[in-house]
From Swiss-Prot:
Enzyme Commission number(s): 2.7.1.21
Enzyme kind, highest EC tier: transferase
One annotated GO biological process: DNA biosynthetic process
Catalytic activity: thymidine + ATP = dTMP + ADP + H(+)
Keyword Nucleotide-binding tagged: yes
Name recorded for this polypeptide: Thymidine kinase
Length: 182
């Protein structure tokens, strides 16, 4: 059917937007599944939770995995597939899984970071983009000047590209404040 990509910096509402879309499909009696990477620690008792603490606890299948291709047989009976924190999946895994599901008449909604704190795109997302029908880029609010923020800076431990954290570790910033921070 199709692939939709929701991207943006930390705290831009990517998971909230994914939750909103999944909820709409649940209300229309579509069978939904939400997948996140094993590294993601924001899921509580099989419920998806965003950084604001809002929980989607409707009827859906929830899967935590580090390999999407291994889940193909499980999700085959579902109409809508939501994938959160897509940047954590391996590039070929994400691209092949999403492409296969869309080709099998599934609606795939993928959410993830637009780039890391060095403003480098994640390989999994760059490989997926050519296969996507729709891209929605969200913005956060710059924590320094309160303008629209398209980037994320890391407060400390800048040698480690992938590190799970929230406001304790990451801050959304605009271009000017990003350049002033590094």
């Amino acid at each position: 059917m199709s692939i939709e990509l929701i991207i943006g910096p930390m705290f831009s509402g990517k998971t909230t937007e994914l939750m909103r879309k999944i909820n709409r499909y649940i209300l229309s009696n579509q069978k939904c599944v939400i997948i996140t990477h094993n590294i993601d620690n924001r899921f509580i008792n099989k419920n998806i939770i965003n950084h604001d603490g809002n929980i989607l606890n409707k009827e859906y299948l929830y899967i935590k995995t580090n390999n999407l291709i291994n889940e193909i047989n499980i999700v085959d009976n579902y109409d809508i597939i939501g994938i959160d924190e897509c940047q954590f999946f391996e590039e070929n895994d994400l691209e092949q899984f999403c492409d296969k599901m869309a080709n099998n008449k599934k609606k795939v909604i993928v959410a993830g970071l637009n780039c890391d704190f060095n403003r480098n795109i994640f390989n999994s997302i760059s490989k997926l983009i050519p296969k996507v029908e729709k891209i929605k880029k969200l913005q956060a609010i710059c924590q320094f000047c309160y303008k629209d923020a398209s980037f994320t800076i890391k407060k400390h431990n800048k040698n480690q590209i992938i590190e799970i954290g929230g406001q304790d570790l990451y801050v959304p910033v605009c271009r000017l404040c990003y350049n002033n921070s590094y």
